[in-house]
Design a protein with these regions (language model features):
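N-terminal, positively charged/glycine-rich alpha-helical extensions of SAM-dependent methyltransferases
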Residues: 1-10
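Nucleotide donor/acceptor-binding cores
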Residues: 39-40, 69
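Short, amphipathic C-terminal "tail helix"
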Residues: 385-390
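Conserved beta-strand elements of the Class I
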Residues: 41-43, 264
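Glycine-rich helix-loop-beta junction characteristic of Rossmann-like nucleotide cofactor-binding loops
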Residues: 30-37
Length: 390
């Protein structure tokens, strides 16, 4: 079979065409067993070269019967559609019903969808969100892999609202460092499994793995699931034992003033860590805040240099940078501390400066030792809290 992408790199980016890896296609296809009634019609609305649809057919008790009677494929690009049909003929000796239509414009009479929608933007819109919204409106259940950006931001409110109409909703989130799902695209992606069987809401945090451990990561996917906190405003990405830190109580912003003697400077370009300094850093990207008094300054210094802020950013935001909105929304925690730990942090921010060149200029940051971060975590986070700095 031919699963070679016919597009060059520029065409891939322009058209948002990234084919589903075979191992991820299997992950998605197996989740269909959760809600497939054995009778309904499945559609792959943007089948590409057929990896997803062929995998879905392959796991059936009678793949040929499934292809002939329960599968529909669609591909707007006729060149890719012809390759897919050839792949089906080679694999099963038969081809499914097929269309060369615009999925968003054409009415398909189907029950379920499995898809990897295009990732490109048109004007200010993410096309993949329209695919999700149509799937929500026309199916009893669907499985999709798409960018993680739908989890927050006002422009995706409608998408999240439609997803919430499904009583069962499970979402797996994948980071793009150090390993990545698509070898030819460095994008954070999510697998959404939405259906009407049972009532369950589950999610993962943004899963990270080293490329050499990809197989074990996939095999242990469900161990990362926790009870989900999904709202129209945000779909939180939570690991087990962290949901309790999401609450509607006091936020960091409740302890800030317009100006004071207690400033903090927070780097806004996180990769593996976020730090807050009592002094301005020699870097382009940082957020300046003023705490209202000495006690709130010290607690903020501890919280913002622990794993907590980094976890919050990964949990509620899908941006590549830390926004002031996300920073100020950090749930506030009151706890006891000793002034000695404050002195340790202030000393560490002087001794553990690191520099990375960006846009021709060295950007200063602070990388506290793991032991210090662990000590800060222990002051107000439970023992099982995810070790995000490992």
């Amino acid at each position: 079979m031919n699963f070679t992408n016919p597009y060059n790199d520029d065409e891939k980016k322009e058209n948002g065409v990234y084919y589903t890896p075979e191992d991820i296609s299997l992950v998605m296809s197996l989740r269909s067993k959760l809600f497939d009634d054995g009778k309904g019609i499945w559609l792959d609305p943007c089948c590409g070269l057929g990896v997803l649809a062929i995998t879905l057919a392959s796991i059936q008790d009678d793949p040929v019967e499934f292809v002939q009677n329960r599968l529909v494929i669609n591909e707007k690009d006729e060149r890719q559609l012809n390759i897919t049909l050839s792949n089906f003929q080679e694999k099963f000796g038969v081809v499914p019903r097929h269309f060369n239509e615009d999925f968003l414009e054409y009415d398909f009479n189907i029950d379920y969808i499995i898809m990897n929608p295009p990732y490109f933007q048109y004007k200010d819109s993410d096309i993949y969100a329209y695919f999700i919204e149509k799937a929500c409106k026309t199916t009893k259940g669907f499985i999709t892999i798409n960018p993680t950006s739908f989890t927050n931001g006002t422009k995706f409110n409608k998408t999240r609202r439609l997803l919430l109409e499904y009583p069962s909703l499970t979402i797996y989130h994948f980071d793009n460092i150090p390993g990545k799902i698509f070898e030819d695209a460095k994008v954070r992606v999510s697998i959404i499994v939405a259906h009407q069987v049972g009532e369950e809401r589950k999610t993962t945090g943004q899963i990270r793995w080293k490329s050499k451990l990809r197989k074990s990561m996939i095999e242990s996917l469900d161990t990362n699931l926790s009870d989900a906190v999904f709202t129209e405003k945000v779909f939180f990405k939570t690991f087990p034992n962290t949901v309790q830190y999401i609450h509607d109580g006091e936020k960091l912003e409740d302890y800030l003033v317009s100006e004071s003697d207690f400033p903090l400077f927070v780097s806004n370009s996180p990769r593996y860590f976020i730090s807050a300094s009592s002094q301005i850093m020699d870097r382009n990207g940082q957020i300046k805040i003023y705490l209202k008094d000495s006690d709130s300054f010290k607690k903020a210094l501890i919280m913002l240099n622990s794993s907590y802020l980094y976890w919050w950013w990964k949990t509620c935001d899908s941006s590549l940078s830390l926004t002031k909105k996300t920073l100020l929304s950090l749930p506030w925690i009151n706890f006891e501390y000793d002034d000695n730990i404050i002195n340790v942090i202030l000393h560490s921010e002087q001794m553990n400066k690191v520099y990375k060149k960006n846009a021709g200029k060295l950007q200063e940051n602070i990388k506290h030792p793991k032991e210090l971060i662990s000590n800060l975590n222990s002051l107000f986070l439970h023992d099982g809290f995810i070790k995000l700095h490992d």
